[in-house]
Amino acid sequence: MYKRQGVYDPNIFKAFFLAGGPGSGKSYVVRRTTGGLGMRVVNSDDAFEKLLKDADLSLKMPDSEEQQREPVRQRAKEITKAKQKNYINGRLGLIIDGTGKDYDKIAYQARQLETLGYDTHMIFVNTSLDVALERNAKRARSVPEQIVVNSWKTVQQNIGKFSNFFKGNFIIVDNNNAQEDILTDVFKRIKNLANQKIKNRRADKWIATELQKKGVKFSGGQSQFKKFAGKRR
C-alpha cells in the first residue's frame, strides 16, 4: 500500500476559495461539505485563536487589548502563509478560507494558482444580515457589530463579481437555515468539481516531472494519470 502524498494525493491542483462574512457559518459548512476530499484548509483564524489563548488574550477582541493583539495576528498570518506555501509546493488540494470582502486580492490569488496549474473554484456561504449578527454574538471569538455590518455589505457587493470570475466553478450556499438536504446537495456539487479531471494543462508538466522522479513514464493526459494513480492508492 502506497501512502498518498504529493503527486499521488487526492484532488491535487484543485483550489476552493471560501467566502462569507463573520457569522455566515463558513466553518460549519466547510466541515459538512468537504470531508473526505483530502483538501488542506488554509485559515489564519485557527492559528490566531490558538495564539490568543496562549497569550492569555480574550477571544472577544476588546479594544483594550488591541496593542497586544496585533503582533499575535501578524504571527498567525505568517504561520498560515508558510503552511499554504508548503501545500502549494506539493500542488495539494486547497480550501482557502476568507471573508470575500477583497475581490481584487482573491482574483489575484486565483490567477497565481492558475499559472501553477490549479483549477480554481469558490464556495460562497451567504446569510441575511440579521442571521450574521445573531451568530456573531454567539461566537466564542466575536467581532464588533459594526464590523459585521460593514463586512456583510462589502461581501454582498462582490457576489456578482465572483460569479463572473469563477463562472461554472462558483457555488453559493444559502446558510440562513441550511437543512441536511441542502448540505448534501452542496457536498455532491463540490465532490463533482473536485473529482473532475484537471482542466489546466499546466498541471501535466508538473505531474510528468514528479512521476519521472519516481521512475514512472507519463506521456500526458489526466485519464492516464488517474488510471495509474488509482492503482497506487
Label for each model-derived stretch:
Residues 6-13, 86-88:
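Phosphate-binding P-loop
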Residues 21-22:
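The conserved Walker
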Residues 15-17:
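Short hydrophobic/aromatic beta-strand immediately N-terminal to the Walker A/P-loop
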Residues 130-233:
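Conserved GTP-binding G-domain of TRAFAC-class P-loop NTPases and closely related GTPase folds
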Residues 28-92, 104:
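Conserved substrate/cofactor phosphate-moiety recognition/catalytic segment
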Residues 1-5:
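Conserved small/polar residues in nucleotide/adenosyl-binding loops
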Residues 114-135:
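Conserved phosphate-donor/acceptor-positioning beta-strand/loop module used by diverse small-molecule
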Residues 25:
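Conserved glycine(s) of the Walker
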